[in-house]
Regions:
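Extracellular/periplasmic head regions of type IV pilus-like filament subunits
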Residues: 61-119
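Residue-level signal for short amphipathic helical patches enriched in basic/charged
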Residues: 7, 25-28, 40-43
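N-terminal leader/signal peptides at the extreme start of proteins
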Residues: 1-10
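Short, surface-exposed interaction loops/tails
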Residues: 112-150
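Alpha-helical hydrophobic helix detector
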Residues: 16-32
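Membrane-proximal N-terminal amphipathic helix
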Residues: 40-66
Length: 150
């Protein structure tokens, strides 16, 4: 009579080694994944702001052609051919993921956007002065992170 033993499965050491390797891979992959999400959101914001800048230039050219004076609209989103996804007209700081707003507060006008991680960013907007000899086309500032109130 033959006595054969079959060994099916993995040893405890092999399973532990696999778990350690998976843990190392996860420790490296998760931060890279989170960085790629943040970079994607920043790129999407840059695309929207670039579209707004191009729309403002076109609006200034159109205004110059019709009125003889280059001017920007009061609301920069009105310079776009198509409405931005997530744009709302509630005149407050964006407070919903993916929301874009234009608002006036304390004498300042700003564009705001909230990302999926609940971080908020703003861009200062000045439509410029269109009166008398002091006429000047406006300005659109750089991205600034809004620090949450404590």
């Amino acid at each position: 009579m033959k006595n054969t033993t079959s060994q099916n499965g993995f040893t405890l050491i092999e399973l532990i080694i696999v778990m350690v390797i998976l843990g190392i891979m996860a420790a490296v992959a998760v931060p890279r994944y989170l960085d790629s999400i943040e970079n994607a959101e920043a790129s999407a914001e840059d695309a929207v702001i670039s579209s707004i800048r191009a729309g403002l230039k076109q609006a200034a050219n159109d205004s110059l052609y019709t009125n003889g004076r280059a001017s920007w609209p009061t609301n920069p989103f009105h310079a776009l051919a198509e409405e931005v996804a997530g744009y709302t007209t509630n005149n407050t700081l964006a407070d919903v993921d993916g929301e874009w707003t234009f608002f006036s507060a304390e004498g300042q006008t700003k564009i705001s956007h909230q990302r999926a991680d609940n971080s908020r960013y703003t861009w200062d907007y000045d439509e410029g002065t269109q009166v008398g000899d002091a006429a000047a086309v406006g300005a659109l500032g750089e991205r600034v992170m809004v620090t949450p109130a404590p």
